[in-house]
Amino acid sequence: MNGTEGPNFYVPYSNKSGVVRSPYEEPQYYLAEPWMFSCLAAYMFMLIVLGFPINFLTLYVTIQHKKLRTPLNYILLNLAVADLFMVICGFTTTLVTSLNGYFVFGTTGCLVEGFFATTGGEVALWALVVLAIERYIVVCKPMSNFRFGENHAIMGVAFTWIMALACSVPPIFGWSRYIPEGMQCSCGIDYYTLNPEFNNESFVIYMFVVHFIIPLTVIFFCYGQLVFTVKEAAAQQQESATTQKAEKEVTRMVIIMVIAFLICWVPYASVAFYIFTHQGSDFGPIFMTLPAFFAKSSSIYNPVIYIMMNKQFRNCMITTLCCGKNPLGDDEASTTASKTETSQVAPA
């Protein structure tokens, strides 16, 4: 083994020289230079400074403007709630641990940080699944006369949290575990060992199949069908130009969210899968640190995409920030006119 395993941790560094210490008790500066830990702290500070206000603003603006409380927006706002949990309960923890060079909050803090990071990522993934299915049903119309309503949205939100918790809760109760990873300043699922005491192997297989491969397969299937249907409808002019334009723009926004998710999370999932399938292989702490910390940027991109590509929300946000007046003078009537009856979302 090219790493050192101990109670509730696995350090990717051989202890032949005797320098390895518990990541819960002492700084891990033998893994990387102190300035690298400072860079991690600065990065986490940036995510907190950007992530909290933009996600909070997304929720606040929606509460202030009733017209934004539409069924499909419930799913999008659900992402903001999950991101806020990640920022408040996860990122603040990682900021402090990075400043100290080790996980100062102990095993309980590691469990909390790992839980919220995993939950946030899984809520985002399953929300994208719900959005993909909604787009498929609305655009492809496999069920005639179906309208995505408030009850469907509430069920979709509940579904995302049930599936996310089905992934993040088991390690708390002994099916796998949360341990520090990379430079030992953030926590995640134990991909590093096959510890039979925690049944790591079965959980990692379950996680990759049920909570990564299956949802991505559903997403790709839905959008594959959707692209084909949109092209066919455009060729046959089956719907009005306004409806087609609105549906295409809503779909484009969701597809961009999927691409952003893949950019953020596929590197982490790929590295985790490599480590799991190459037990005992030689890899450094930075090998897992970079994708793990890069994945945390997912807390920012969803609201940014939503704000940039949703004109109605953009106007409402400007109105809220400017104390009830929109200095740009955009006509809300032109915005709401572009809404579709099926999705109730007004894209840019």
UniProtKB/Swiss-Prot annotation:
Region (Interaction with SAG): 330-348
Keyword annotations of the record: Acetylation, Cell projection, Chromophore, Disulfide bond, G-protein coupled receptor, Glycoprotein, Lipoprotein, Membrane, Metal-binding, Palmitate, Phosphoprotein, Photoreceptor protein, Receptor, Retinal protein, Sensory transduction, Transducer, Transmembrane, Transmembrane helix, Vision, Zinc
Ligand binding (Zn(2+)): 201, 279
Cytoplasmic side: 62-73, 134-152, 225-252, 309-348
Record PTM N-acetylmethionine, positions in chain: 1
Lipidation (S-palmitoyl cysteine): 322-323
Glycosylation-annotated residues: 2, 15
Residue positions, PTM Phosphothreonine: 335-336, 340, 342
PTM-bearing positions, type Phosphoserine: 334, 338, 343
GO molecular function: 11-cis retinal binding; G protein-coupled photoreceptor activity; metal ion binding
Domain of life according to the entry: Eukaryota
Extracellular face residues: 1-36, 97-110, 174-202, 275-286
TM helices/strands, residue ranges: 37-61, 74-96, 111-133, 153-173, 203-224, 253-274, 287-308
Classification via InterPro entries: GPCR_opsins, GPCR_Rhodpsn, GPCR_Rhodpsn_7TM, Opsin, Retinal_BS, Rhodopsin, Rhodopsin_N
Sites bearing N6-(retinylidene)lysine, chain numbering: 296
One annotated Gene Ontology cellular component of this protein: plasma membrane
Membrane topology: Multi-pass membrane protein
Subcellular location: Membrane; Cell projection, Cilium, Photoreceptor outer segment
Modification(s) after translation: Phosphorylated on some or all of the serine and threonine residues present in the C-terminal region.
Record has Transmembrane helix as a keyword: yes
Annotated S-S bridges: 110-187
Listed GO biological process terms: absorption of visible light; G protein-coupled opsin signaling pathway; G protein-coupled receptor signaling pathway; visual perception
PANTHER family linked: OPSIN
Similarity annotation: Belongs to the G-protein coupled receptor 1 family. Opsin subfamily.
Function as written in the Swiss-Prot or TrEMBL entry: Photoreceptor required for image-forming vision at low light intensity. Required for photoreceptor cell viability after birth. Light-induced isomerization of 11-cis to all-trans retinal triggers a conformational change that activates signaling via G-proteins. Subsequent receptor phosphorylation mediates displacement of the bound G-protein alpha subunit by the arrestin SAG and terminates signaling.
Name of the molecule in the record: Rhodopsin
Gene: RHO
